[in-house]
């Protein structure tokens, strides 16, 4: 973290620098003009994590500044949503005088939504007892007069949910509202307003699609649920069980009837498609019945593994969302042999950092 770089007056210049850097990095692929989707310059992060410093009777949040090589007190945090900032102040005022709630507390995590819900996770270097549970329940009751809040306590091999361990986000995407269950300690898009722009872009580039869609690494169904409207059917894979469970909830709450989620890794699915292995999890699913002309991938920072990349290359159209331009560039060295980049986008999920979220649509040459 570099707090000095977080200056809204420099946001436009920083975004321009990112665009230029991205264009130069991918010039060899003869990409079309970069479509740039800006973030809000402040209060854009829907989640934040803070360490907690104890100093006598005082108690405060802090982060580590790599430039200063020191901890920095954070009574407020410019990137975090307005809701998180409001909760930060209200929560610390409650924690300071309460021995049971502050004793050996070392971290606080916040997960907020545009829909107004917020989840607070309190992390401890001690086991949590009945007194903690009682005090935490009273804390939740007091905070509930101002917030739609849930509280979780965590310690080594211990997790206490006072109510539920998730929030439900509502995103207005074009003329539709999509609802997403977001589970504590699971991946969610951190910048909700940019996430909306990503969904709208993905919907736009897949308009008038033929056949079915295959999605790898689908998470909680964020993209596949929004894209289902553009395809006859959608088949999606995800390995993490909490994400699969959330995806099933999201399919139901959004009334999506043409989306099937399979719990397996991209590598396993590649083997299944190549008929190298059979999987009990695929019983009742006829993979051969799907006519997937389009594949959607949103891989982890490491990019797509060689076997899966070969699978991906077999589709007419490839929609690739990347959180790491370096591994995207590596993957494009192979994909560019058979496909051409026809749409290219920069999504500024993480202002004031070097991080660049990118999207490319590739179509067979």
Curated annotation (Swiss-Prot):
Keyword Methyltransferase: yes
SUPFAM superfamilies: S-adenosyl-L-methionine-dependent methyltransferases (SSF53335)
UniProt keyword Iron, yes or no: no
Catalytic reaction annotation: uridine(54) in tRNA + S-adenosyl-L-methionine = 5-methyluridine(54) in tRNA + S-adenosyl-L-homocysteine + H(+); uridine(341) in tmRNA + S-adenosyl-L-methionine = 5-methyluridine(341) in tmRNA + S-adenosyl-L-homocysteine + H(+)
Catalytic residue positions: 323, 357
Residues holding S-adenosyl-L-methionine: 189, 217, 222, 238, 298
GO molecular function: rRNA binding; tRNA (uracil(54)-C5)-methyltransferase activity, S-adenosyl methionine-dependent; tRNA binding
Function noted in UniProt: Dual-specificity methyltransferase that catalyzes the formation of 5-methyluridine at position 54 (m5U54) in all tRNAs, and that of position 341 (m5U341) in tmRNA (transfer-mRNA).
This protein's name: tRNA/tmRNA (uracil-C(5))-methyltransferase
